[in-house]
Amino acid sequence: MSEVFKSTDQARSLLLPKLGSLLQKTDEMPWQDCGAPGFWAKPLVEDASAGVRTWLMKVDTGAFSDMHAHNEYEQIYVLTGSFYDQDGGYGPGDFIVRSPGAMHTAGSDDGATVLLFYSVATDESG
């Protein structure tokens, strides 16, 4: 599978808290290039042992990512702007879930901000 969106943030804790809460002040975080032109991320949680990633992603006007897939479930909640893939277009409040390995494109005609959740697939026994 072609994994195009990758975090490079190792400067702060991204692990799920063992106790209490984890606060990420997203307004104070820089946008990071995440491997595809015009796609920028603020990684909020990246915990490989728990099999989860949560990102805030900004998609520039006109940005497009070719067909690719992720090894995890991908859940997308559109916060602002417009976002599209090979199946259609989405706006604020729309929620999309992709299965692991689902080939898809991604892009925006006029810019978008989305919240992304990635989680590993587990078998039915948990």
What are these regions (language model features)?
Residues 84-105:
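Short acidic-glycine-tyrosine-enriched beta hairpin
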Residues 100-125:
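Ligand-binding loop in jelly-roll beta-barrel domains
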Residues 60-61, 69-86:
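Glycine- and acidic-residue-biased ligand/ion/polar-headgroup-sensing regions
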Residues 43, 59-70, 120:
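Short beta-strand/loop turn elements enriched in aromatics
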Residues 1-50:
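A short, N-terminal "cap"/entry segment at the start of jelly-roll beta-barrel domains
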Residues 41-43, 54-58, 75, 95-97, ...:
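Conserved hydrophobic/aromatic beta-strand scaffold that supports enzyme active sites
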